Regions:
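P-loop NTPase motor domains
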Residues: 1-70, 137-147
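Residue-identity detector for glycine
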Residues: 3, 28, 33, 60, ...
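Short, surface-exposed linear patches
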Residues: 8-12, 66-70, 105-108, 125-129, ...
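Sequence-level detector for tyrosine residue identity
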Residues: 15, 31-34, 124-126, 154, ...
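Short clusters of small/polar residues that mark proteolytic maturation junctions
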Residues: 57-58, 107, 157-158
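Short secondary-structure boundary/capping segments
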Residues: 60-63, 98-101, 120-121, 160-162
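Conserved ATP-driven motor cores of ASCE-family P-loop NTPases powering translocation/secretion/packaging/pilus
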Residues: 69-155
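Conserved P-loop NTPase motor module
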Residues: 138-180
Length: 180
């Protein structure tokens, strides 16, 4: 289903983008000041557990792989933004990593995940990404943000979750207020 939805979104946005460009060109001289009337809105596609739909090339393909890779490579021009989440960057398709403008990574320790992060090290970075991740403070929520547009890497901290979390690890001993 993800492959079909991705392909359809891509095709629809390409058609819409062409119409938007024709509208803008027809307005000629006031091109920069012309506000395009969109028939289809710009799209954000969010995919959790992305390695399940975009596995590393060495593993093979899923029915969604080709459509998602096309969106990753060509989707920016027609107005499609993609947000992928995975806890295993070593298992995700190489294009998902190399086509990313922003990468947020918490501390990773598995060797394939560290290697995957180091593969996206850009020429403007003096240290490897794994060095940056390893130098993070050992606090919950610590992460790095790699911004390809500003060509910088930023340390960051994600605030604690305030809502119920279905994926939380079970506790053998119930947590009481006085054990915080």
């Amino acid at each position: 289903i993800i492959g079909l939805v991705s392909k359809r979104l891509f095709n629809e946005r390409m058609i819409s983008r062409k119409d938007e460009e024709i509208q803008a060109v027809q307005h000629g001289i006031d091109y920069m000041g012309y506000k395009v009337k969109r028939k289809m809105p710009l799209v954000w596609l969010f995919i959790d557990e992305a390695h399940e739909f975009l596995p590393h090339e060495s593993v093979g393909k899923t029915p969604a792989t080709d459509a998602l890779v096309q969106v990753l490579r060509e989707g920016r021009q027609p107005g499609i933004s993609v947000v992928l989440a995975t806890q295993q960057p070593g298992k995700i398709h190489t294009d998902a990593m190399t086509q990313s403008d922003i990468v947020i990574s918490h501390r990773v320790t598995a060797e394939p995940d560290v290697k995957a992060l180091n593969q996206i090290t850009q020429s403007y970075l003096y240290d490897s990404i794994s060095d940056k991740v390893n130098n993070l403070p050992r606090l919950k929520g610590s992460a790095i943000l790699l911004d390809d547009n500003s060509e910088r890497i930023y340390p960051m901290r994600v605030r604690p979750r305030f809502t119920w979390h279905g994926g939380e690890a079970p506790m053998a001993i119930p947590k009481s207020d006085d054990t915080d």
